[in-house]
Amino acid sequence: MAVGKNKRLSKGKKGLKKKVVDPFTRKDWYDIKAPSIFETRNVGKTLVNRSQGLKNANDSLRGRIIEVSLADLNKDEEQSFRKIKLRVDEIQGRNCLTNFHGMDFTSDKLRSLVRKWQTLVEAHVDVKTTDGYLLRLFAIGFTKRRPTQVKKTTYAQTAQVRELRKKMFEIITREATSCDLKELVQKFVPEAIGREIEKASRSIYPLQNVYIRKAKILKAPKFDVSKLLELHGDSTDESGTRVTKDFKEPEVLESV
């Protein structure tokens, strides 16, 4: 009789299944808190693996980028075309405190603005706020008919486009460098900078639909917990101060 394993008997062991462990049992939910400049403070929740050994859950959460519609943040459907990026900077208990990280337009909004018979004017400029944030702001605008114009098209000449772009540079730089990041974000919602550009461009070529379509943070100052807590106020509050859309007509400037 041959000595060895009986292959027929050993075959049954291969069919044994491993015990399935639900990966969600090792994770925790954290609340994401938006700064107090937005009406809705509770943005949502995020998952992270529990702290284990040398791996800390807080380290995994810091630096996460969350993209939220401004319509959800301010409970205003008219602002649904703006996307706000928030960055997790600090963890307090089960709350992730965020700060503004960028702003962009939805692609459908941008496509709806571009039309025939008009000239598109774009500009981008790097600015530094009073609290040390270096941002790149992208502006967009379109030519429109003059009040007494009969002609169908509203094409601007190359020299006029150059002058309009120069005016955009000056106004964006002036408005952004004279305030901190919080005040600059509050200028995006009522489109105060866009209206300033529209007023200043009347003498060159009238513009319409002027927006700061994108804002990108290139460099941030050294992280300060006290400033972040000041921005959030009481992090347990579920509502903040809504940014109003009321626009006050600025004084007419003789020279820019």
UniProtKB/Swiss-Prot annotation:
One cellular component (GO) term of this entry: cytosolic small ribosomal subunit
Major subcellular site: cytoplasm
Any one GO molecular function term: structural constituent of ribosome
Record bears the keyword Mitochondrion: no
Subcellular locations according to the entry: Cytoplasm
Biological process (GO), any one: translation
InterPro entries: Ribosomal_eS1, Ribosomal_eS1_CS, Ribosomal_eS1_euk
Keyword field: Acetylation, Cytoplasm, Ribonucleoprotein, Ribosomal protein
Positions of modified residues (N-acetylalanine): 2
Signal peptide: none
Record text on subunit structure and interactions: Component of the small ribosomal subunit. Mature ribosomes consist of a small (40S) and a large (60S) subunit. The 40S subunit contains about 33 different proteins and 1 molecule of RNA (18S). The 60S subunit contains about 49 different proteins and 3 molecules of RNA (25S, 5.8S and 5S).
Record-stated family: Belongs to the eukaryotic ribosomal protein eS1 family.
Name of this chain's protein: Small ribosomal subunit protein eS1
